[in-house]
Amino acid sequence: MAVLKMTDLDLKGKRVLLREDLNVPLKDGKVTSDKRIRAALPSIEMALKAGARVLLVSHLGRPTEGEFDPAFSLAPVAEHLSRALGFQVPLVRDYIDGIEVAEGQCVLCENVRFLKGEKKDDEALGRKLAALCDIFVMDAFGAAHRAQASTHAAVRFAKVACAGPLLAAELDALSRALDAPAKPMVGIIGGSKVSTKLTLLDTLSKKVDRLIVGGGIANNFIKAAGHEVGRSLYEPELVDEAARLMAAARAAGGEIPVPVDVVVGPEFADSAPATVRKVSEVKPDEMILDIGPETAKLYRDILMQAGTIVWNGPVGAFEVEQFGQGTKALCMAVADSPAFSLAGGGDTVAAIEKYGVVDRISYMSTGGGAFLEFLEGKTLPAVAVLEERSSKG
């Protein structure tokens, strides 16, 4: 993707606005997961090392727009950043009409969603944000699918607009996996409902050589293959769609393999006993909650031969130990595979972390909705405007 990158520019003495995704979970005024802060740190440190005057901008939660609400303040993030960087990062509440930042200093601007017009991609607000800096750096991949004032309008009106290191790395990884993938290409799509990932399943089934489905999504395909699913979560109105996707994949020379065995339980509960059954032997009062060991072996064989793996969603209810063995086996297979592996989505990342293979996945995306929309083939507004700005020079 042809976008100007922060690494292409001389930042010394320049006012550099870094739009990051610091939308972290909070409890009792404390950050409970600093994953997004850690992901942004290299970009911040790079800008500071280059002698920039750094302004950080981010949203947090969903406050009422145009109103200050201490429950959605970035104050806990400023504290966390100060500890991580080793110096005080002041939180500035009134910044929209201009702010003085010294060379080598970093300030955090208060929640951009407190500003009226942010969500509507307001042009006037975009111009004001753009006027705060000499260089606008869009680095928030997690918000790149939203056309908002701080991710879109400001990019349009900034003197210079570019992609930050984190966004650039995301785009490089996604392009490598989707634009010119090493073959065979394997997709793994899990989750509870086909309806939420129908576009993704449709897009990937035409692109990949094999499409592994898991979780509640797989139950629709099991049903479409003529097997009973008992009391399992599935969507009866989408069984025909699952059959169509399997037929379309076959017609294109690919495959959506159906599990040969599954792990069932009487209910989805921590105390529920787990039983392995052939997929053709699921009883009416049972729920499918994981793939079985034979299926895990088949999927491992597929993944070990892959050139590219794109993964979104677990294949079982891995939050309950006895229904997590399939997802664990899949994690190990992706980690062991020589393929370029790209994973994204909250549950997928949680599984990768739980089973200790973070360092063995080629790239883990920081985006949720943005990752899915990119995989679906949709244009991300923040990326599109960066490409437009770059093409005009």
From Swiss-Prot:
Primary location recorded for the protein, binned into one broad class: cytoplasm
GO-annotated cellular components: cytosol
InterPro entries registered for this protein in UniProt: Phosphoglycerate_kinase, Phosphoglycerate_kinase_CS, Phosphoglycerate_kinase_N, Phosphoglycerate_kinase_sf
Reaction(s) this enzyme catalyzes, per UniProt: (2R)-3-phosphoglycerate + ATP = (2R)-3-phospho-glyceroyl phosphate + ADP
Keywords, alphabetical: ATP-binding, Cytoplasm, Glycolysis, Kinase, Nucleotide-binding, Transferase
SUPFAM superfamilies: Phosphoglycerate kinase (SSF53748)
Stretch forming the signal peptide: none
Pfam families named in the record: PGK (PF00162)
Protein name per Swiss-Prot or TrEMBL: Phosphoglycerate kinase
Organism: Nitratidesulfovibrio vulgaris (strain DSM 19637 / Miyazaki F)
Lineage of the organism: Bacteria, Pseudomonadati, Thermodesulfobacteriota, Desulfovibrionia, Desulfovibrionales
Binding site for ATP: K197, E319, G345, G346, D347, T348
Residue numbers binding substrate: D21, L22, N23, R36, H59, L60, G61, R62, R113, R146
